[in-house]
């Protein structure tokens, strides 16, 4: 038990090292997964670690009534089988790189269908209860509290669903930088070599699953052609032969002439603006001329300004307003006089009628 608690299982063991943060894989990366030889001799019972520890103790039947005896019994089973589980999970994995890469490539090449369900990959004839290495259906209480915590996305080695294949991808960095992807794959337990193992894939190149950034989108249309001067300036320091320089000098004018003949000349912004300004100036002059002619006509209607040749617009408006008030008063006075004359006319008609009756 003490040996299992303090014995390290990998070469170059470093407690403070976090190999998930590594972004530069090397040829010796799989040496991290080269396991130290097991502390016991690998004999006929090496494939099944349960046989090397002897027969399993029978399930307790008469301990349901006494809680203290049950707790002591569970502690004894915990001390016995925790070591067995750790040995089974740590010493029965891959020890070389080629079988691991072959298994992963086969698994990823086959791929899961769209309607993937983990139960489709389970073997119907296989009974986990009969396997000595799978203790989940026999000891659910012991395996419910794992001793060693795995990473947040990977499953614990003592998971009860051993016959299922689960692939989990973990992304630790942003899309713009290189990031390792941790994949946990669980294979069939019927094969003694296929057990839970962890691999770390470092993405060195472009992540093809990531969306394209906006600046990398392809622009529609043909690219703009370089002017002849810029083309000559860029090609001159290249150190090419004289013949190539002559070809470069002669080609751009032909392309420019073809482009000018095919494409119509666009209207320049200055010409457009000048046309708009010219039309606006014409309308403004017309408005001012109409206004001036109207003011001159109004000045001629006002008797006080008829003899004045140069009068401001404000003076014309003031005198015209006063003249309108005078005309309104004269009209009212004339209307009153008209009513008086109408009244006198009626009185005279009545008098004529009275005198004609005699």
From Swiss-Prot:
Which ranges carry the bHLH domain?
A: 274-326
One GO biological process term: regulation of transcription by RNA polymerase II
* Annotated keywords: DNA-binding, Nucleus
Tissue specificity statement from the Swiss-Prot or TrEMBL entry: Detected in adult testis.
Keyword Cytoplasm on this protein? no
* One cellular component (GO) term of this entry: nucleus
> Mind telling me which InterPro entries this protein's record contains?
bHLH_dom (IPR011598), HLH_DNA-bd_sf (IPR036638), Myc_transcription_factors (IPR050433), Tscrpt_reg_Myc (IPR002418), Tscrpt_reg_Myc_N (IPR012682)
Q: Does the keyword Lipoprotein apply?
A: no
Pfam families cross-referenced by the UniProt entry: HLH (PF00010), Myc_N (PF01056)
Return the annotated region ranges for Disordered. 150-171, 219-245
Compartment(s) of residence: Nucleus
Q: Where is the composition biased (Basic and acidic residues)?
A: 227-242
The Gene Ontology terms for molecular function here are:
DNA-binding transcription factor activity; DNA-binding transcription factor activity, RNA polymerase II-specific; protein dimerization activity; RNA polymerase II cis-regulatory region sequence-specific DNA binding
Tell me how this protein assembles.
Answer: Efficient DNA binding requires dimerization with another bHLH protein. Binds DNA as a heterodimer with MAX.
Write down what this protein is called.
Answer: Putative myc-like protein MYCLP1
* Origin species: Homo sapiens
- Gene label: MYCLP1
């Amino acid at each position: 038990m003490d040996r299992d608690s303090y014995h390290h299982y990998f070469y170059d063991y470093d407690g403070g090292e976090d190999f998930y943060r590594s972004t530069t894989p090397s040829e010796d990366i799989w040496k991290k997964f080269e396991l130290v030889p097991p502390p016991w001799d690998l004999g006929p019972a090496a494939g099944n670690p349960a046989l090397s520890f002897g027969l399993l103790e029978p399930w307790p039947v008469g301990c349901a009534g006494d809680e203290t005896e049950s707790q002591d019994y569970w502690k004894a089973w915990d001390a016995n089988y925790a070591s067995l589980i750790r040995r089974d999970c740590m010493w029965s994995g891959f020890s070389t790189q080629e079988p691991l890469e072959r298994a992963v490539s086969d698994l990823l090449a086959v791929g899961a269908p769209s309607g993937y369900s983990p139960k489709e990959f389970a073997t119907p004839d296989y009974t986990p209860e009969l396997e000595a290495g799978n203790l989940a259906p026999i000891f659910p209480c012991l395996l419910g509290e794992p001793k060693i915590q795995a990473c947040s996305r990977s499953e614990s080695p003592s998971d009860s669903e051993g016959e299922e294949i689960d692939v989990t991808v973990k992304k630790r960095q942003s899309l713009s930088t290189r990031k390792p992807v941790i994949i946990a794959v669980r294979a069939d337990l019927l094969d003694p070599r296929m057990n839970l193992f962890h691999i770390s894939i470092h993405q060195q190149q472009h992540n093809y699953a990531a969306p394209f950034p906006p600046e990398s989108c392809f622009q529609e249309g043909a690219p703009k052609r370089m002017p002849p001067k810029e083309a000559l300036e860029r090609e001159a320091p290249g150190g090419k032969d004289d013949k190539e320089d002559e070809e470069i000098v002669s080609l751009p004018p032909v392309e420019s002439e073809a482009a000018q003949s095919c494409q119509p000349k666009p209207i320049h912004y200055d010409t457009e603006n000048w046309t708009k300004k010219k039309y606006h100036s014409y309308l403004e002059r017309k408005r001012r001329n109409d206004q001036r002619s109207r003011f001159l006509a109004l000045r001629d209607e006002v008797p006080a300004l008829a003899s004045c040749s140069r009068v401001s617009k404000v003076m014309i408006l003031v005198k015209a307003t006063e003249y309108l008030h005078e005309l309104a008063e004269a009209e009212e006075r004339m209307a009153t006089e008209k009513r008086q004359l109408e009244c006198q006319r009626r009185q005279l008609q009545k008098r004529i009628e009275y005198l004609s009756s005699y």
